Amino acid sequence: MNNSQINLPLLKKGKVRDVYDAGKMLLIVASDRVSVFDCVLPSQIPDKGKILTQISNFWFAKTISIVPNHMISSDINEINIILKLGLDPQYYSGRTVLVKKCERIDFECVVRGYITGSAWKEYQKSGTVCGEKIKEGLKEAQKFPEPIFTPASKADTGHDENVSFAYMLSHMDKNLAYKIKDTSIKLYNFAEEYLKNCGIILADTKFEFGLIDGDLILIDEILTPDSSRFWDAALYKTGTNPPGFDKQFVRDYMEQTGWDKNPPPPAMPQSIALAAAKKYKEALSRIEKGSV
């Protein structure tokens, strides 16, 4: 699925998800669209939206004791009854969720357990990660002594921007900022421990939060191949860009094309899309089984 068509006001067509206004609730449909470097590619990954939704739903249930979340229902028949809609289960089942509407906090909350990606590039240049000084001598893909919290300012369109925690503190209630940081690291630590049994290293991940009546809740997606780097533990070694089960495979391909990371992006070959789909399915299988 590339686009959804539902008889509700479309609040936002995101990079991957279509968000509809359902009064005090939101209806979210995860498409098979692919976003890399904040640009939506003209190609899709088959069943990606269903896989992301299934993984998110798994983690929302697993982490409810750490932080409440926005979930109401992911059952398409129940959603049809609640909203008095006639959504075709063949088209919308598995990729559609009904959630609580909230006040979104406009920061992406990134937790990094290992140095890689943009953090590695910055570290090579300046010895910092998101402006924070990091100890010298780290190799690519090396584990940090402790997970680090590196927020990013949230952009609906264009590039999200890495910022320091000090910047975050200066742009919102300080107590709330510290609670978000603490909760993000707790979520990361919980997932990292669980994923060890799955043969997956959680290199880094991002969370998004909102407020309902002043209470912090977890929203959007959680611990998916789109929002996380999942490395194959069997193939991990420092000094490399370890292979895994996530969107990094597509990012790496797109970097090799010579594309300047500005719109419009080039198409992704079908062979790359199918290989990415296989990686996403492997992540889902391992996560649901709780083992390799």
Swiss-Prot record:
Q: Which CDD domains match?
A: SAICAR_synt_Sc (cd01414)
Q: What is this protein called?
A: Phosphoribosylaminoimidazole-succinocarboxamide synthase
Taxonomically, what lineage is the organism?
A: Bacteria, Pseudomonadati, Elusimicrobiota, Elusimicrobia, Elusimicrobiales
The gene name reads purC
Q: Which Gene3D superfamilies match?
A: ATP-grasp fold, B domain, Phosphorylase Kinase, domain 1
Keyword list (alphabetical) reads:
ATP-binding, Ligase, Nucleotide-binding, Purine biosynthesis
Q: What class of enzyme is it?
A: ligase
Which EC number(s) does the record attach to this protein?
A: 6.3.2.6
Pathway info = Purine metabolism; IMP biosynthesis via de novo pathway; 5-amino-1-(5-phospho-D-ribosyl)imidazole-4-carboxamide from 5-amino-1-(5-phospho-D-ribosyl)imidazole-4-carboxylate: step 1/2
Question: One GO CC annotation, please?
Answer: cytoplasm
MF term (GO), any: phosphoribosylaminoimidazolesuccinocarboxamide synthase activity
Highest taxon above the source species? Bacteria
